[in-house]
Regions:
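Phosphodiester-processing cores and adjacent nucleic acid-binding clamps
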Residues: 1-175
């Protein structure tokens, strides 16, 4: 894990015009990150990696409500306020081992947000790992229908067999 100051320094040294930070389930580093990036002349993109379940966030049942990762990044003030609302709701109403949101909350608070399918823990990837291509495509379509052009399929290459196996399918889904 990288420290905020080191991330901003790396961005400066590599002439990156913008960088994002997406803590898991929280936004603890958002203010420090914003201030350091702004001071360095870098566009700070504030986000969060959420834990999303498919059921009611008030139900405390992890066996029937698997958690998936989902990246949300604020693209404007409305998006930032919606990030805060989602994080607060996840902690105050949806907490069960982890702060959770669901698709119903996303429908209510999606404005001003950019959405990415996330890592191997994301719902699209989890279906692909189980060889459920059609379900993965359906999930991606549901998010694209909600976020429109602000929904992105995330490709990662950390030299992991799972990513090597699923990235070609992710590229097909992204088209």
């Amino acid at each position: 894990m990288i420290r905020v100051g080191d991330l901003v320094k790396y961005a400066q040294e590599n002439n990156l015009p913008a960088i994002a930070i997406t803590d898991h389930g929280v936004m603890y580093s958002a203010v420090e990150f914003y201030e350091l990036a702004e001071h360095a002349g870098i566009n700070p993109l504030i986000g969060c990696e959420f834990y999303v379940n498919s059921g009611d966030i008030h139900v405390k049942d992890s066996a029937n409500n698997p958690l998936y990762h989902l990246i949300l990044i604020a693209k404007d003030n409305k998006g930032y306020k919606n990030l805060i609302k989602l994080v607060s709701t996840a902690w105050c109403e949806g907490f069960y081992y982890k702060p959770r949101i669901n698709f119903e909350l996303l429908k209510e608070y999606h404005e001003g947000l950019i959405c990415a399918s996330a890592c191997l823990g994301g719902e699209v990837l989890q279906h692909l790992l189980k060889n459920e291509y059609d379900q993965a495509k359906e999930v991606a379509k549901r998010y694209q229908d909600l976020f429109g052009d602000d929904y992105y399929i995330e490709l990662q290459d950390h030299n992991m067999d799972e990513q090597k196996r699923t990235n070609p399918d992710l590229m097909k889904i992204a088209k």
